[in-house]
């Protein structure tokens, strides 16, 4: 296409060529923003968000302390300091309002899409192909889990730095001056990726694959291998740290739990599953049932995989992108494919975030003969992007809250215990004990040896008054996993409700030896106070405050112990602080009123009892004490 000016003819083709990638990216960004708009109203979910972020006291440290802890501490079977720092900053800025945390995830995903475009364009020089791949990556429903799940910040951050590492490496390869600075930048970005999540641990191998195509520099074998040595050393160090941490926290399945044959079968099935879900992204869920894989099915999958690899190898001269695409997809899945089993999930949507790029690369470059500027082709691409946006927007709604997420998971795969267990937790916290018991029971039907469900049932039965059953579940939880701190805590609570205080204190102490939590400190302090060990009880409550300075229950218990020790002013101060932190804390208001009544300050005591009853109309002690004060006041008036 050309247009004539007064003196010369000016081609408009370059403008058109630049306009198409920009239009594709703009469409994808707008579509992604629309599809994820609802997350601003979403909550934290019970899968990891509570433990990782919302209730993680370590993230509330000052920034220097947060950095120090992130670099040296392990939490939730992970070492990923940059992710912890990111979550800590979010908590400082947004508090426990999930909207801000979700919005940051969406922005990171959008940024990853833009970086992916820049990386692929730098690697291949193909702007339109790169834009199509980046657009499909942005709007694909398989990535909803990585974006709408706050705890998957680690996947987004790791991918951001991983893509930057590849981009810098591509610049290094093609640069004519100051090349080594770009290689150093690539190495630093890789280190940051591993410090966010060891998702990109296979990057050194991926760089060699990219050296084959599109960089076409495999002839310089010695140089290629030498420049990868620092990357390989970082990958080895990260792998060792990950294996140590995962094994120490019991997150890795033993060979006895999952046999090598089963691991290989699951890996072959998972490769097919990820490829299929990229093409047909339906029935996506937060957890999936492990599929039964027969020997015959395993043989078919292995043969299909072998044929595909053979075909890509045979086509390496004419269509080198096929081998690169296959190796990108299959190689980057290795850490999460189940050969080294972490957890019990056979596959997960979030694991496709990086490998899917390889599939998209193969498909889009396989369509390279298309005229991407043709109206029909552009309309088809727009239609595909639109359909994916609609499907993504629908999948995003699944993450609105715990019930939506968990019931959806059960609608996809009924025979998995974790959604039932977490629904039990949700209904217990919302006061629906009957439904909680139902889902805990269903969880044990699916997995009778689920220690976490036995732990939850121990405390629930004890609270409902069936202490014998609660103790039985607590003992079973500990038999199944003796180093589970919450199991010891739940058993201690069951013993406490049964009046077996000495055994309760022992269980709480064992829990604290495994993991020091403020709630368990308060539980043991409460038992010690009931046994008149006031000084040790006070020490437990004060230690709970060191762990969580905003723990209202700790202040309330300190006030109670101080009152029993005769220090009424200190008791009042503690109750005041408890009610300032939690204005609807009925027990603290009632205890404060009792101290004031003892001092003869009846009018203020009555006000405290009134506030206690406003917060909890069923608070019997506050009602009785207020009635007593009103009778005293009536008698005085007469």
Q: Predicted regions: what is each one?
A:
Residues 418-428, 452-462, 486-497, 519-530, ...:
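Conserved alpha-helical positions within TPR/SEL1-like repeat arrays
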Residues 598, 606-610, 614-638:
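Terminal, low-structured helical/coil segments at or just beyond the last alpha-helical repeat
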Residues 412, 446, 480, 513-514, ...:
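Structural marker of alpha-solenoid helical repeat scaffolds
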Residues 2-466, 472, 479, 486, ...:
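Polytopic membrane enzymes that build or remodel cell-surface glycoconjugates and lipids
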